[in-house]
Design a protein with these regions (language model features):
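Secreted/periplasmic proteins
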Residues: 8, 13-116
């Protein structure tokens, strides 16, 4: 009974985290996917830019949907790419179309992410 209750609570849990973000303008994603096909995409960056592990968000699967919020504006986006990251250690890279939809004009700022 305890295990069933714990499992149900686990299912209700949603990851909500404030993370440092940047944006990028690449045309092709990690699987040769077109990042300008009308979708909204993000790239998961690396914990250490030199190691390129692409797991700053825990190693999300390609296509994983996140609700990304910036200054009160939210957009659902899919993981469409990965990246090394940069010197200030952002965790997520917003594709330029997603950044525009969010009003994300700063090169480096915080966004809130949660599973969609």
């Amino acid at each position: 009974m305890i295990n069933l209750i714990f499992f149900n609570i686990f299912l209700l849990y949603k990851m909500v985290e404030k993370v440092l973000a940047t944006y990028f303008e690449d045309k092709i994603g990690m699987r040769d996917n077109d990042l300008y096909d009308g979708g909204m995409y993000y790239a998961e960056l690396s914990n250490d830019p030199k190691k390129k592990d692409f797991k700053a968000l825990g190693g999300l699967k390609n296509g994983h949907k996140l609700k990304i919020t910036y200054n009160g504006v939210s957009v659902i986006a899919s993981k469409g790419d990965v990246g090394a990251g940069g010197p200030k250690h952002p965790k997520i890279d917003l594709h330029i179309n997603l950044a525009k939809a969010l009003g994300f004009t700063n090169g480096l700022d915080y966004v809130t992410i949660e599973d969609a």
